[in-house]
């Protein structure tokens, strides 16, 4: 076999091997020079960043949708929705550094960019560049409030309040980064990625669980349903010179990761002022989790 491969006479085996090597080399050149980027400044190679049209009419539509009542109840939640709107406006203003116009937009962009690079997996993603941010104009709308009676198996448990929530706004984020290929050497090549992510709709039921009177560290617990609805709209570009637009698998991956993060943080506990410290509340929560885990193991 060795004599056949290294023979000076052209053979079928030599032609087959050379043909396969040629295909591999050609494929490597196509990937490296069309899709991958080996420059040190990846943000300079992509001049177009997909964005959504952010017209004032759309913001007005989002604001109008928040003010409409979903159902006719005896007790309206309009007062609480108005309160949520004001709270959301305060958070937006603080994120913008209490600045208006383009200056406030730039402040919010810089803060979000710093946070994104702080939590990014440095071994896989290059620096993240935030190009634009839309913080929205509305707030979640709550409706259909109802009371859930105490658990008959646990007479000490307090009644729970449950209501439905829907959030439709103009939240969007436009960014670019690069996926790093660390073989055969570190940062051997980069795959530039440009993304624009926009929220279409979030819908879920929310439970509010008050603390028991004898609780060591009284907290108010908010829990979203694990069956929440999350609709995101994404536009994407992948590649350096030759670009792939709106890859479906990338959209599915982003939506899955956002759902996973929300599902993992589906419970929020608010310490009641003057009754306990945050540290005491954390210790109480940890103790409850350990007891719950122990009961599950025994079962």
From Swiss-Prot:
Q: Which InterPro entries match?
A: Mmm1, MMM1_dom, SMP_LBD
The record places domain SMP-LTD at 73-281
Show which residues sit on the Lumenal side of the membrane: 1-15
Q: What is this protein called?
A: Maintenance of mitochondrial morphology protein 1
List the Cytoplasmic topological domains: 37-299
Question: What's a single GO MF annotation on this record?
Answer: lipid binding
Q: Please, one GO biological process term?
A: phospholipid transport
**Assembly and partners?**
Homodimer. Component of the ER-mitochondria encounter structure (ERMES) or MDM complex, composed of MMM1, MDM10, MDM12 and MDM34. A MMM1 homodimer associates with one molecule of MDM12 on each side in a pairwise head-to-tail manner, and the SMP-LTD domains of MMM1 and MDM12 generate a continuous hydrophobic tunnel for phospholipid trafficking.
Source gene?
MMM1
Example of a GO cellular component annotation carried by this entry: ERMES complex
Write the lineage as a comma-separated list: Eukaryota, Fungi, Dikarya, Basidiomycota, Agaricomycotina
Keyword line? Endoplasmic reticulum, Lipid transport, Lipid-binding, Membrane, Transmembrane, Transmembrane helix, Transport
What is the native source organism of this protein?
Answer: Coprinopsis cinerea (strain Okayama-7 / 130 / ATCC MYA-4618 / FGSC 9003)
Q: Where in the cell is it found?
A: Endoplasmic reticulum membrane
């Amino acid at each position: 076999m060795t004599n056949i491969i290294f023979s000076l006479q052209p053979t079928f085996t030599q032609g087959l091997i050379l043909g396969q090597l040629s295909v591999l080399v050609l494929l490597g050149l196509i990937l490296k020079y069309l899709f991958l980027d080996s420059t040190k400044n990846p943000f300079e190679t992509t001049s177009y960043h997909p964005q959504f049209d952010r017209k004032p009419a759309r913001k007005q539509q989002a604001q109008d949708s928040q003010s409409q009542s979903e159902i006719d109840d005896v007790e309206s939640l309009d007062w609480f929705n108005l309160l949520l709107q004001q709270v959301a406006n305060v958070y937006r203003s603080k994120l913008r550094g209490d600045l208006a116009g383009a200056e406030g937009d730039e402040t919010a962009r810089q803060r979000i960019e710093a946070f994104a690079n702080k939590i990014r997996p440095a071994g896989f993603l290059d620096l993240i560049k935030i190009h634009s941010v839309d913080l929205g104009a509305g707030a979640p709308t709550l409706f259909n409030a109802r009371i859930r009676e105490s658990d008959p198996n646990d007479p000490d448990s307090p009644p729970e309040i449950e209501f439905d929530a829907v959030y439709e706004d103009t939240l969007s984020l436009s960014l670019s980064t690069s996926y790093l290929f660390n073989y055969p050497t570190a940062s051997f090549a980069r795959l530039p990625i440009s993304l624009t992510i926009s929220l279409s709709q979030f819908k879920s039921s929310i439970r509010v669980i008050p603390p028991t009177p004898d609780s060591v560290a009284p907290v108010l617990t908010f829990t979203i349903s694990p069956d929440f609805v999350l609709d995101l709209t994404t536009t994407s570009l992948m590649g350096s010179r030759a670009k792939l637009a709106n890859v479906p698998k990338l959209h599915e991956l982003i939506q899955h990761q956002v759902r996973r993060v929300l599902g993992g943080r589906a419970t929020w506990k608010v310490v009641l002022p003057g009754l306990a410290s945050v540290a005491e509340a954390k210790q109480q929560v940890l103790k409850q989790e350990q007891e719950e885990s122990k009961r599950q193991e025994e079962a």
